[in-house]
Amino acid sequence: SGAAINISSTDDGIHANSDSGVLETGEDGKGIISISGGTITISTGDDGIHADKELNITDGYINVLTSYEGLEAITINISGGQSFVYAADDGINACTGDGTSTPLINITGGYVDVTTGSGDTDGIDSNGSYTQSGGMVLVKGGSSSGQVSGSIDVDGNITITGGTCVALGGICETPVNSVNAYVFSSVSFNAGSYSVKDSSGNEIISFTLNNSYSNGWICTSALTTNTEYTLYCDGSSLTNWTQSAGTCLLYTSPSPRDKRQS
């Protein structure tokens, strides 16, 4: 909390082990990482931040510039701060580990920006479920020839009850239990500054892309049923719609994605 840390490594940037007797005292490792402030910048050839059991981010500024997988643990809780992640494989990964815990990514606040590289990758990947009740999440995935990837990939469910999630890329799994969502079925997302505004010109959400995507959805508690909205890019209208309840699932081929988001 409060420090400025710069890490360059070939192995994991930050790692918390849960192996038996791993501590100098002979005690078992806890496998828990908690970040409550400060600035952390990581360039690594493996995981940016890896906790064998639990990763908790409540505040601070995290920038994973390069990694194989950005943030990884069985349970990942993000309630605050700003997290920017670039990964060659999965950006945020809730993986199976001890065989007794169900993987979960739970976001209740903060700002999260995830970009993945080319290939069979996922922006957010949970071997369990993904839940979000607050915060802003911008996740960008895609695919290369003969390989498929997604913005959010889960073995369980995507449940969004609050906050905002913008998902762009290849196969975009959509929430099963959520606040209002909208899937863009005929919009190509090119590089630029995007905003969603209501009919009175009030800005609901905004985000910036460095490259192009051909599939995406937004899910936010700021969308109101039976209200008209317009999506803009660099000030020009791309599409408009009247928000209705419910979501749909689309499969489309993605365009090249951001290679890096700084």
Regions found by a protein language model. Give the residues of each.
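A composition-driven surface/loop motif
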Residues: S1-S253, R257
